[in-house]
Each structure stands twice: as structure tokens, then as C-alpha cells.
Amino acid sequence: MKLKELEKPAVQAWSPARQYPVYLATGTSAQQLDASFSTNATLEIFEIDFRDPSLDLKHKGILSVSSRFHKLIWGSFGSGLLENSGVIAGGGDNGTLTLYNVTHVLSSGKEPLIAQKQKHTGAVRALDFNPFQGNLLASGASDSEIFIWDLNHLSVPMTPGPKSQNPPEDIKALSWNLQVQHILASAHPSGKAVVWDLRKNEPIIKVSSHSSRMNCSGLAWNPDIATQLVLCSEDDQLPVIQLWDLRFASSPLKVLESHSRGILSMSWNQADAELLLSTAKDSQIFCWNLSSSEVVYKLPTQSSWCFDVQWCPQSPPVFSAVSFDGWISLCSVMGRSWEAQHMRQADKVPEQVAQASLIPPLKKPPKWMRRPAGGSFAFGGKLVTFGLPSIPVQPVAQACSRPVFISQVITESEVLTRSVVLQEALGSGNLLNYCQSKVQQASLPCEKILWQFLKVTLEQDSRPKFLGLLGYSREELQKKVDTCLKSDSKSQESPQLEAVDLKSDRAHSPCAQASKHTAKEASESSAFFDELIPQNMTPWEIPTTEDTDGLLSQALLLGELRSAVELCLKEERFADAIILAQAGDAELLKWTQERYLAKRRTKTSSLLACVVKKNWKDLVCACRLKNWREALALLLTYSGPEKFPELCDMLGTRMEQEGGRALTSEARLCYVCSGSVERLVESWAKFQQASSPMALQELMEQVTVLSRSLELLQGSNKMSPGPATTHRLTQYANLLAAQGSLATAMSFLPSDCIQPGVQQLRDRLFHAQGSAVLGQQAPAFPFPRVAVGAALHSKETSSYRRGLQPPQQVPAPSVRPRTTAQPSSVMPFSPSQPSPSQGSSDHRVLRPQAILPGHFVPGVRPALSPPQLSGGQSVPAVNPAGFCGAWPLPGPTPVMASPDFMQPGSTHLPETPRLLPLPPVGPPGPNPLSSQLPASPVTFSVAPPPGGPRAPCSSALPSSGILATCPGPQDSWKVSPASQGNLQRKKLPETFMPPAPITAPLRSLGPEPQQALLPQPLVSSATLPPPGAPRECSLQQLQPLPPERTEKELPPEHQCVKDSFEALLQRCSLTATDLKTKRKLEEAARRLECLYEKLCEGTLSPHVLAGLHEVARCVDAGSFEQGLAVHAQVAGCSSFSEVSSFMPMLKAVLTIAHKLQG
């Protein structure tokens, strides 16, 4: 495809590969003259912008020079500097070698001329810069002169050695070796190539052809193999390209022969060593594949010869070609056709231009499109990589193994280490030490207290330990209480001593002495005196006044304890009220406590109320959040095991909602106490804004320990994780799987979770472990199993059965013209009964229905044997002329029978038939199956229209045995012209026996279009039977007409087969020239329609389908020999009746394509 063009008679040179943007330098050619015959010479530089769709080049710099150029080359010497774009060297007449500074040419500033030397004796036609040392320039001219110039010291050039040619001759080409920097090769018109070693300063090998007509016009080294070079011949009698290997220099390694005239120039692609570009006097530009020795790209120039072609160093698919008519064209081997492009000179040609031919791109993808390396991540943290082999390049292309490496990528090594430690602790059951180590490793106070709580969950009698972690210990409290009581006892010590003294004085008093003496005497005399009240007690008074005390006394006297308690509460005598309430029942005591707590407002009254009432929900909801520790301690002390988890969750939720982020981490302690794993995970998600692998690992450790403690507490009753926990477990399992720890990841997945994502991950983890899970039961398949083939068959069967449902009443059709058939004789035929179809499960009884009005029976066909097509299928017979009608003729025709011979329950309908034969027609009798029709015309009696008299009429089959369709705008059946010809030539035998009923679907036929209703000549009255005469047979419609069958679409998985074959037929039709081949291709296109219909119906076996797909792939790849081999294998292993309708034609198409390709 042409990209750019420039009208200028010049030689060319591309900018070096590291130069950006891309430039093209042109110098006025010494071998050409323009239309003006100007003798001026210029050096110009153009910028190449491939994004610009126009064909023009951007002019960037121009310099007038003194002489024209035979050769132009652009080197990278000094291009490492930002202000330097390299050096252009030009070879001219009289041995002139000129060097230019590209930067100065582009800027038009300083003098761009670096140096001009005239050491050579003739025209300088060969130049090349050393690819390793940019300061070394090789030049060649007449008289076998070769100089090596050092751009740093241009005064005296060096020679690679003594002149090797005798007699001396011109140097046509020079080329430095692209692998070894001190090797230089030169080409000579005599057909020899000399390889020079600059270290030895002598030629080391000479390559020459055995043919004396070899005239070397070009030379190039292999970019990859240091010992290979190519030579091209300018001789018209030997236009060849020779590939030489210096290790086998006795003869060329390959000889490329496709040009018809001498080769003028060639260029070896630096990005793909298999591609070699050549141009010759035959006005052809060829791109060769040196591995296969074939031309992979052709570009006719359609003008004069191109004497120079060069690959673009920066863009591998682009090359430039310079022609003798003064045009420089920039083309690409990746395009379709440069002739399809709009060219500037198209309007200049007045005569008719021939149609442009399609020029295909490269047949094989070039090397620069091949990925040198690639990789892809796989499940389980696997990295699959590939790269180019490190083995040295072979002289001849050979199949080499390309290794694929599978590596395990671990990005979270600390997560894996901690996961292993956790698994070891779980396996050994030593979680207490694990928790203790986590407490010691915790850096934050909140994390430390959390792990302490988690450790307590694993211990016995955990509530007191929780209280201790909250800062409340029974031992410490007892010590504080004892200290407080001791201080109170010291302050009350003096009053107690005075009381003892009073007792002592009273004991020594005379009254006391007398009393003690009297009591002693009384005990001796009688026990009665032991019960006497001591005389020294002070009597107390029971008040009966109207004040509070009197009312209280009266209430107590009457046993009204409630009233007494109310009086005490009124006077705020709370102790008296409580004491009196205890003397009553429990209800009175509770009521008294409530009244007391309602009246008494102290700092501890709310706490006392909660303790007394045991209303912990109010405590959780009403306490201040700064006292969350005290609230949790109360729950731990007083709450029962039934309400305790719920109350702890309520407290933690309130702390999260009202306490903000400060209390969110503390709320997790409440969830640990309650054993709520789900709430713990939800709280972590709120507290941890951005989840990291390490944070997720920490959470999983906490969840695992808490879950294990619950298992120990509840025994075997394992609770299912909630949605949040399941999500984090799945996330953690994915993290472990990504690090390659598949077994551990699978152990963390909930076993009873039915979420699709979890089930799919479990199934994936199980199968990813490979042999590690041998002997274990595989998890359930995570996807619903769908039997595609069975579902499609069931769908077709159900739709057909719905079409056979007999309606309760047949609607009367619209009025249409009466048609009758001409009477004629018909050959007798034997009636036959449809045989039951295998596999059918739908047994129906056909009941007689009302006969349709009119002199025709729609949908009825005689049971005539249709002509056989290839593949064992048959084309159904078309309607006789006597049965033309405007009603549509659907594919699956219902069974029509006379009530004389059709018995209820005797018909077994096939499952999915396309056509059913006509039921036996004959005179009524006891055994209609054995009766035959006479040779006289067969008559059919039909019912008159509703409301009209029964007027019998007869219609007969046509006398001719030719099966003809009714004339109309459309045929009744969609058959090919060849099949129609067979139908018309098919004659019925003299004694015709109907075949067995057709129970298999006819796949090659489309839906029947509606026939046009055409009138037929009326039958004379002599042929009509008299009124009342017995009718020979009566046709009654027993089933309604099913809906017209719609043509099925080709399944998407088989669309590629049809596309490949149709594209192949189109290409062959365009390429074929003889009439016989074109006709054969047209016939093949018709025959392949049978294949496409079989693909639509799904009747081909998997073996045949696989073979067709493989043939299609071979067709797409252009490998027709391989396609014929696959075709032969499929045809040999398949049933003849299955593939005979399309396989022969497919082979014929492949054979034609193979011949056209050759």
C-alpha cells in the first residue's frame, strides 16, 4: 500500500533508527535528468509523518551542492548529542566523497559541509557506515578501491587490504557485518564477493558463483546470522538472488528465482531476518521469505524500473522505492493494495485504466509483530510466561521448542507466614499460647485488650476474667470494703465502752442484786417465774392519735400493711417502709421498692433500680457511653446467659452509632463477650477504612479464634457465618489462593454456604490442587447443568405436539371459487397405514371432524413415492393439479383418514414428521387394508357449503404420471433446479406401490409457500354420479392445519463453517477462468445448502461436525492439502447416508482451490 510519494529524480537515504522524527534525505541523482535538463544539484531532507493521510512529504531542509550523487547514506555519528542529527555521506563523480552535518542542513544556519575528499579515481557508488563504530565509513569506487574513513581523522584513509581483483573492477556494493564489527564485504560485477578482515588487513574468503553470467549488483549481510550474506545478479539471463553461508562457501545455500529480468537492488529487513526486498528490471518489487524461499509480497510498479529499494529503519513494514521516471514511493507491506489508493497522477491519464488488482499483504505475520515475551497471570498466583529461545539462530529455519514457564508469585509473604502459624495453632489446639503471643505482639492498646478478651473466651469461667480485664476485681473490692469498715469501727469505739460501764454499774447496784436473788429463788420454786418480764424494762406506748404515728399504729393494729407502708413513704421513712413490706407478700415488697426508687434520687439510685428490677435493657439504652465499661461489667455480673449476647450486641451497636470512631474499636469487646462473629466483622469494616492484606489477616485471626471458642462452648452445633463474615472469608480465601496457598484457602471457605461465588471458588480451588486432593470428594458442580441437545429436541417436540392438538370445532373457511380436476385414469395403488414412530410418547386418537366445504381437501397429498436425493433423503411429491388451492401447505401435514377404516386408538403419531403419506383411499369394506382401487378414475366426495344441498362431485387425479405443480407465483417446494429436473423426468411405474411412511424429517426442504388458487375446467355431468348413488370414498379432515413451519437459523458455533466455505467458493469463482470449473462451483454452492440445513437442524454427528470445523480452519489458513486429508478421514469414518449429500462437492471445491492456488 502506498503511503507517500515524491516526484524527484534523486537517490535516497533514511535517517538512522534512533532518529525522531523520521526523515528521508534525497540527493540529485547523477544517473538521471529531469524534464528541464537542469544541471543543478541539491541535498534535501523531508519529514515523514505517517499520521498524515496525504501523499505529500513535509520539506524540512535544502542545500545546494556542487555535484550530483551516485550514493547517499545517513550515519549516526554524533547523533548522541541533542544538537546533532548525524552525518550524511554522499558519493559523486570523480571520486568525490562529501560529508554534511544534518543539524545544520535542517536549521539552515552554519555551514553544513564537514569535509569533501577526492581520494578515489572513479565514481563512488558504494558507501556504508559501521553499525558498531559510527565514525568508520567504508567507500568503494572504480579500480577495486576500498577506503575506510575515520570521521575523527579524515586526512588519511586506510584500506582493508591489497586489491583482490585482477584485473581491477568497480565496487558495486559494500556492507559491514552486522554481528562482527571488523568484517566487511564487497561485491563486484564479475560475480564475486570478497570478505575482508580489518584486523588482519586482508581478505579472508571469496565467494563466487559457478555461472560466468553472475553480475553482482547488490550485497547484504543477514541481520541475525554473522556467516550469511545474499548477492543479487543484474544480468537478465540470470536474474537470481543467492544466499551464501561462509561455512559452506562451495555453493549457495539457496537460490531465489522469480524475477524475469536482472535485479537492480535489494534490502534485508533489520527487524525480521526472513524478509528480503528486491527490485528488478521487470518492474516488480518482491518481498521474499528466505526460510520458505517464496515470494510473500508482490508490488508491480506499473512505471519504469526501480533502481533502489530500502527498508525504513524506524518502521519495519515501510520501504521506499526510487524509480527511473523520477518518483520516490513510500509503501507498506502490511496494506492491501496501493492501486486502490487515490494517486495524484490518476487524473492525468485520459485513456481507460484497467481495474486495479488486489494485492494481498504478507502471507505470514512478520517477526516485528511477534511478541518477544509475554505473560499472563493464572489462578492460584501462577504466572505463565514465554520468551524467545536463548539458543543461537540456526542457518536454516528449523522448528525449535519455545519453553513456557509457570512461576508462583508471592507478594504477601508475611500474610503467608502468619497464616501458617495460625494453621499450626489450630492443628495443635494450643490457641491460648497463640493468643498470648498476639497480646505480646500488639502495638496498640485497643488491639492488646481485644486479644486479651479473645484469650478469655477460650478459658473456663470467663465472666469474672472479663470483669478483671474491665478493671473490676472481687478481691480488690473486698479489700477496699474491709478498709472502709475498719475506719468506721474505730470512730464508734468510745460509745461502746460507756455502754459497758453502765451495764457494769447496774450489775453492782442493789436493785440488780435483789433482782438476781429473786430470780434464783423463783427458778428453784417454780418455772413460771422464768417467763416473767424483767422489771427493769421501760414500757413503750402505742400511739392512737390522729397524726401520722397514730394512723400508722392503727393500720398495723388492723393488719393494713400496705397503708402503713404508704404512710412511711409519705414521711420518707424509707427504712420503716421496707421493713414493713418485708413482713407482707412479695408483691408489696416489689411495689415498695419501686416507690422507694422513684422517690429516692441519688447517684446510685439508677444503678440500684437496675439491680433490683433486673431491667438491663434500660441500662444499655440509657447509660452514658463514657460508662460503657461499667455497663458491660453489670451485664457480666447480673445478666443471664439467655439475654447476655443480645444485651452486649445492643451496647456495642449503641457505642458504634453514638460514640463515633473513638468507641468503634471498643465496641468490638462487647461483640467478643457476646460471641457475635458477624458483628465483629461489621465493626472491623467500619473501623478499617481501607482494607489491606495485613489488616484482613488480623481480622481472620480474630474471627478464627472467636469461632473456635464458640465451637468449644456449643459443641458440635456449628453456626453458619453471616453475609459479612462470608464476604471476608471469601476475600481472604482469594488472597491466600493468589499467594499459592490453595489448601489453606479452601479450609477457610464456609462448607455450608450456598452462595454462587463461594461455590464457584470452592470448585476452582479443589480442581486447582490437582493430585493433592486425590481420594477426596469433589464439591458440587457450581453451575446448573443444561443438556443443550436434549433441550432443543424437547422444544421441537413440544411445539409439534402443540400443533397436533385437535380443536373442538373446525372453523369454516372463507368462500373461494370451486375447482375441479379433469377426469382421467389413474394407476391403482395399494393403501398403506402409517407405521408408529420410534421414541414417540404422545399417543392420540384421531376423531373425525366436519368436512371442509369446497371441492378440495387442503393439505392432502397422494402417497406417491418422491424421487430420492443423495443422502437417502427424498423430495416430497408436489401437489397434483386437482388439489391446487389458496390454503397454505404446511410442512408437517396432519393425517387425513376416512372414518370407515381409521379406528380410534389405532394411530401412533410420529414425533416430528415433516410429511405423512396419504391414508388409504378405497371403497368401504370390512378389511380396507387389503382392498385396491380399480383402474377407473378415483372420485372424491366432499361436503357442500353449510346450508346448501349435498351435491356430490368428483375429482380425479391427472392421467399423466408426471408430477407437476400448480402454476402460481411461488412453487410449493423450495428445491434446486437440478432436483426439479429430476422430478419432471421421473415417471411412475405401471404398477405403483406406495413406500413406507416417512417418519424422519426432510431436512433439505424449506417451508411451503402458499399456493395460488387457479380455476380448473368443470367436469361434464356424465362423469358425476346420480343423486343418492353410493360414494366411493369420503375424505374428512381429522386435524387442523398446523402453523406454517419457520426456517431455523444457523447456530452461532457453526457460522464459521458456512462463512469459510462461502468465502472459498467466492474466491474460486473470481479466480477460475474456464466455464467448466465455474459451472462446477455453481453446482457445489447449491449442494452445500444441504450441509447448511443439516447444521441448522443439528442432525450431523459430533465426529462429522468436528471434521467440518477442522476443514474450515484449513480453508482459512489456505492449507487445502491438509483440508483434503481431513476430508478423507471424515468421509471414511462416517455414515454414507449422512455425508453423501455434501461431502463429494466439498472435496471438489477443495481440489479446485488447491489447483488454483498452485
UniProtKB/Swiss-Prot annotation:
What compartments host this protein?
Answer: Cytoplasm; Cytoplasmic vesicle, COPII-coated vesicle membrane; Endoplasmic reticulum membrane
Keywords in UniProt for this one? Cytoplasm, Cytoplasmic vesicle, Endoplasmic reticulum, ER-Golgi transport, Membrane, Protein transport, Repeat, Transport, Ubl conjugation, WD repeat
Task: Tell me how this protein sits in the membrane.
Answer: Peripheral membrane protein
Give residue ranges of the WD repeats: 4-47, 65-110, 119-159, 166-206, 209-254, 258-298, 301-341, 376-407
The segments labelled Disordered in the record are 485-520, 797-843, 968-1010
Q: Report the superkingdom from the record.
A: Eukaryota
Signal peptide range: none
Q: Which GO terms describe its biological process?
A: endoplasmic reticulum to Golgi vesicle-mediated transport; protein transport
Q: Does the keyword Cytoplasm apply?
A: yes
Q: Does the keyword Cytoplasm apply?
A: yes
Indicate the family of this protein: Belongs to the WD repeat SEC31 family.
- Entry protein name: Protein transport protein Sec31B
